Structures are given as structure tokens and as C-alpha cells.
């Protein structure tokens, strides 16, 4: 568990609201309001919702669940409202695979990089202008799977943590700490000063990734957007660049696939911090 990720709510705590299900007033349910930046967001899908309910840093406003899905709910301080699948379809974005369950909750507050470092993180991912929310969610999920406790994103040119990201992350946004920074290059300098070996992925590098991460006590993996890759200033700020060896017939990997491979390689090749 990453305690830092669980201690940055927009608002502290969650209002106790009982344990039994109730039925909402249906007219209000069918008037969805657009999400505003910094305001409450909808999260949906079993893994995303269960993880949000288990996170004490989440302030949950509403828990909507169908009759079929209510049996899967753990005991919670949040009173579930029984709805139909059609109700959820109307409330959530088109195409949302909700599995009969959704919550409306305040977003988690991003942490400061210095706090993540002080917390004792040894594996951190840094994303340079990765803008696709599905890729971002998948990267959160891989980070959680391979022991990366922090994900550094740009304040701009990176998507907010919406329900789409949360669904792709399968609950990992509740345990992997989000950090936002204006300047990725400066963040890499800060990581280097804290003893992190910063490795940027670049297909043109002659150095294989397994050699670049071998023996590092603290590691930061840096990934750029698909197509352009790392920006020149960000690449220059990395301690070194490395590549994932792939077949010559393929030019590159999807950024979320590359992240999963890189995180695995780093977790396998790095050494525990003293």
C-alpha cells in the first residue's frame, strides 16, 4: 500500500451515510451535469469503485448500483442508491462499461514531488505529454503491479484523472500517487538530486533497458508521447536513454505496453534502497 496516495483528498474524510440501500428520486437522476475541472467526477466499474470506497481519502457524494450488482458491495459508510442499468447509461459518458456500479466523488489532490520522495519512494514513473486517458489508466495499473508508487505528470498536456482513466487503471489511481508538475525537466533534476537514476525510453538509443536499470537503488522511468517520444529538453534531463529491444519489423510499441515492460524490467533489475 502507498500511504501517500491515500492522504491527498480534495476534502478530508467521507460523510457517514448508513449501510442500507435506498432508492433515489428518479427525475433528478436523469439530469446529468457536466463535470467541471476540480469538481466531483464519476468513477465506474467494479474495480474502480471498490478501490474508491476502500480509500479513506475519497469523499464520495453518491453511490449508484443496480439490483444485480448490489450484492457485490462491501459494507460501506456510503448509502447505495438502487438504479437500473439504463439510469447509469444516461448518467455516465456514452460507452461507459459500468458493470452496474458507479460513484460520484471528489478527485484526489495530487501530491508534491518532494513529499513523494520524502515518503521513501524508490520507483517513480514520469510521463512527458502522454495525453490518451486509456493509456494513462493502463500505465497507472502497470505501475501498481510492479511497485511504482508515484506517477509524475505535466500540469498541462496531460489528461485529468477522470472515470475513463480510473476504469482503465482498475483501481490503481487509489494507490499510486499522482504528482503534477509544470516542468518535467526540473522534476527530473529534482529526482536526480534525490538519488534517482532517471532513464528515458528512446527507440534510437543503443543501450538496452535491462543494462540501464541494473543495480539502481532508486529508479525513475521516463516515457514520452507516442510518435514524437520524449521532447529534446526532457531527454537531455535524463541521466541516460535506453531502448526496449523489439523486432526490426516493428517501429515502436504502444506507450502503455512500453511502460509495462519497462516497469517490469526496472522491478527485476533494480536493487532495494539502503
Predicted region positions:
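N-terminal positively charged helical leader segments and presequences
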Residues: 1-118
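Structured adenosyl-cofactor binding patch, chiefly the S-adenosyl-L-methionine
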Residues: 50, 145, 167-172, 232-274
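Short glycine/serine/threonine-rich phosphate/pyrophosphate-binding segments
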Residues: 134-138, 230, 255
Amino acid at each position: 500500500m502507498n500511504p501517500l496516495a491515500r492522504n491527498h483528498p480534495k476534502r478530508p474524510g467521507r460523510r457517514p451515510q448508513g449501510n442500507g440501500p435506498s432508492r433515489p428520486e428518479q427525475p433528478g437522476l436523469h439530469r446529468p451535469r457536466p463535470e467541471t475541472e476540480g469538481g466531483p467526477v464519476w468513477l465506474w466499474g467494479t474495480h474502480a469503485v471498490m478501490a474508491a470506497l476502500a480509500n479513506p481519502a475519497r469523499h464520495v457524494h453518491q453511490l449508484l448500483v443496480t439490483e444485480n450488482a448490489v450484492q457485490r458491495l462491501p459494507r460501506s459508510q456510503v448509502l447505495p442508491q438502487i438504479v437500473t442499468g439504463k439510469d447509469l447509461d444516461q448518467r455516465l459518458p456514452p460507452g461507459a462499461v459500468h458493470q452496474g456500479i458507479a460513484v460520484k466523488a471528489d478527485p484526489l489532490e495530487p501530491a508534491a514531488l518532494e513529499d513523494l520522495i520524502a515518503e521513501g519512494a524508490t520507483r517513480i514513473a514520469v510521463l512527458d505529454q502522454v495525453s490518451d486517458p486509456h493509456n494513462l489508466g493502463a500505465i497507472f495499473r502497470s505501475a501498481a503491479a510492479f511497485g511504482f508508487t508515484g506517477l509524475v505528470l505535466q500540469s498541462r498536456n496531460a489528461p485529468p484523472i477522470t472515470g475513463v482513466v480510473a476504469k482503465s487503471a482498475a483501481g490503481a489511481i487509489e494507490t499510486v500517487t499522482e504528482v503534477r508538475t509544470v516542468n518535467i525537466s526540473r522534476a527530473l533534476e529534482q529526482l536526480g538530486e534525490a538519488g534517482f537514476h532517471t532513464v528515458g525510453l528512446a527507440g534510437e538509443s543503443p543501450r538496452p533497458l535491462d543494462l540501464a536499470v541494473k543495480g539502481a537503488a532508486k529508479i525513475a522511468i521516463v516515457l514520452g508521447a507516442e510518435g514524437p517520444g520524449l521532447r529534446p529538453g526532457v531527454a537531455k534531463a535524463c541521466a541516460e536513454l535506453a531502448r526496449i529491444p523489439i523486432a526490426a519489423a516493428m517501429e515502436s510499441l504502444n506507450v502503455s505496453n512500453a511502460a509495462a515492460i519497462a516497469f517490469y524490467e526496472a522491478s527485476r533489475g533494480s536493487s532495494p534502497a539502503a
